[in-house]
Regions:
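N-terminal positive-inside, membrane-proximal cytosolic segments immediately preceding the first
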Residues: 2-49
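TPR-repeat structural position
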Residues: 88-89, 125, 161, 198
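Short solvent-exposed coil/turn linkers within tandem alpha-helical repeat scaffolds
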Residues: 101-108, 137-145, 172-181, 209-222
Length: 234
């Protein structure tokens, strides 16, 4: 009988499927996987070690940042105390060192504002500008807005009218506090008057009035200022 001749009653599946061969293939796969796992055991240990090392590094970093912030808060409090006893020059030196050491922390931003303010009080306007510009604090935080408002006043004190006006208006746009917006717009209006931009000053006073309630007593103050400036235009 030819090997391709099918016996009566024998189906194709019955003739082709070999249960023993299928089992052999499965056992071969299991043995192969077992051998691979044994051969790559060191690799698996390395991966596990790296995962553990990464987790430990993350925990260390979080602890480090927490300790840094705690140290910064404690150190800044100590500097505040030195200011209250009038050791101002020493306080400035300590604040400068503090800003460098704790750069990137909220306390460093607060120290920058404090250092800039001390230089402003001593009329060291150029130094104040250098400190505040170097910090480059964003107006996305309350401390950043304070720093930029202080920088605007330092520009103004140095007669940098264009920079001061632009900075005051930027602070007014960024702040959510009514008094900061009002003070910044009023400062910008004052600069425009100095530069004889009377119509520009009136525009800023008008913007202040629009933000005040109809019964706000301060409306009379700004209305009078507008009238005074309008008289200068004539």
């Amino acid at each position: 009988m030819s090997k391709n001749t099918r016996r009566p009653g024998e189906t194709v599946s019955e003739r082709q499927v070999d249960p023993l061969a299928t089992e052999d293939r499965f056992l071969t796969w299991v043995v192969g996987m077992s051998d691979w796992m044994k051969g790559n055991r060191d690799f698996g240990l390395i991966v596990a070690f790296l995962v553990m090392l990464g987790g430990a590094a993350l925990v260390y970093y979080m602890d480090f940042k927490r300790d840094q912030i705690n140290q910064a808060a404690s150190r800044l409090e100590s500097i505040h105390q030195s200011i209250t006893i009038s050791a101002l020059e020493d306080a400035k030196a300590q604040l400068s060192t503090f800003v460098e050491r704790f750069s990137g922390t909220p306390q460093a931003e607060e120290a920058t504002v404090l250092l800039g303010r001390l230089h402003m009080e001593d009329e060291d306007f150029l130094v104040a500008i250098s400190v505040l510009e170097s910090a480059g604090l964003s107006m996305g935080t309350a401390t950043g807005i304070q720093a930029n408002s202080l920088l605007a006043r330092a520009y103004e004190a140095q007669g940098r009218w264009s920079d001061a006006e632009e900075q005051h208006i930027s602070v007014a746009s960024a702040s959510d506090l009514d008094f900061e917006v009002r003070e910044s717009l009023e400062a910008a209006a004052r600069i425009r008057i100095t530069q004889r931009d009377f119509s520009g000053a009136i525009e800023l006073y008008q913007e202040i009035l629009e933000a005040l309630a109809d019964d706000d007593p301060r409306r009379g103050i700004y209305t009078s200022k507008m009238a005074e400036v309008a008289g200068s235009v004539e």
